[in-house]
Amino acid sequence: MKRLIILNTAEISIILPTYNESKNIRGILEHIKKSFPSNLKLETIIVDDNSPDNTAKIAEDYFHSIKEKSSHSINVIKRKAKNGLSSAILNGIQESSANTIVVMDSDFSHPPNIIPKLIDAIKQTRCDIAIASRYVNGGSIQGWPIKRKLMSKVATLIAKKGLGVKPHDPMSGFFAFKKNILDGLKFDALGYKMLLEILVKTKGVKIEEVPYTFTDRELGSSKLDTSTIVDYFKSVWKLYKYGRTVEKDESRASVRFLSKAARFFTVGASGLAINYLASMIFSLNSDMWYIHATTFGIIFSISSNFLLNKYWTFEDRDFSPKRTII
């Protein structure tokens, strides 16, 4: 991976993952530059996956043409292979010098004039994540056929219902966030929806949505293909499993107030109580002989002891059949 490194501490870092964007890259960089005051320390990080159309070279040439008269720096990261959008974004985050980061596409589907609105949302509302949203009041999509819109709606519904995320547009690829909210988190970098993974893995963050009009690209070709769709479902499944694991860990942590020995004793005592109560209930409320009632009481106490020991006393053990069958 080769880089054009510009040493600079920026106020805002903008990450542009690219692949074969030679027709758009210079124009998008010019529009980004025009969207901010000339004295603002702005850093654009281009993460290029070895584009054969010289996208990275065009970006480098553009930077050399403006660096003497602008505080806008451009860092071009050249990767040796096409490793995916999410991993490109993570590369960009690692190389960024600002705490406020913007992620966007370079094909003009994400209008650069919306970037200041995202930054304002973070500064004025003190939110942690500002999402450019197609699905809030004032947002829309232009240039997509009905089939593509339907696919987007279904993907959004799956993310919201399946993963429990709250924003209207969790599938947006255009968003800003405070870099420090990612501290301590590990990412799978699978697929192309980095925002979705951030939403699932960050807790207690404040989110704002900014409406915008998504416009389908005019130049270059779309990156959506079958592998992208497959990666999406893979990432949703992995995030779902991640969420379930976190829920289990939190549930277990909430009852970790007794040692294993104390829990085992407590479960045993509760079994005696359940045995006694069940025996009394069966004998007093039916014509059942006391021996039969006691037998049912024993069955209830054995069952309760088994379940309590499995899910509480030994909650850190895996009792799945493949682990328990010898």
Can you say where each PLM-predicted feature lies in the sequence?
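Acceptor/aglycone-binding surface of glycosyltransferases and processive sugar-polymer synthases
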Residues: I77-E95, P112-Y192, R217-S227
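Cell-envelope/extracellular polymer assembly enzymes that use nucleotide-activated donors
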Residues: E11-S13, E43, E197
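Conserved donor nucleotide-binding strand/loop of the catalytic core
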Residues: L42, I46, A56-E95
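Short aromatic/hydrophobic "clamp" motif used to bind/position activated sugar donors
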Residues: I101
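A conserved acidic beta->alpha catalytic loop
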Residues: D48-A56, F108
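Short, acidic, metal-binding catalytic loop of nucleotide-sugar glycosyltransferases
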Residues: H31-K41
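Acidic helix N-cap motif at the loop->helix transition within catalytic regions
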Residues: K23-G27, D53-Y62
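Hydrophobic helical membrane-anchoring modules
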Residues: M1-T9, K160, F187-L272, Y276, ...
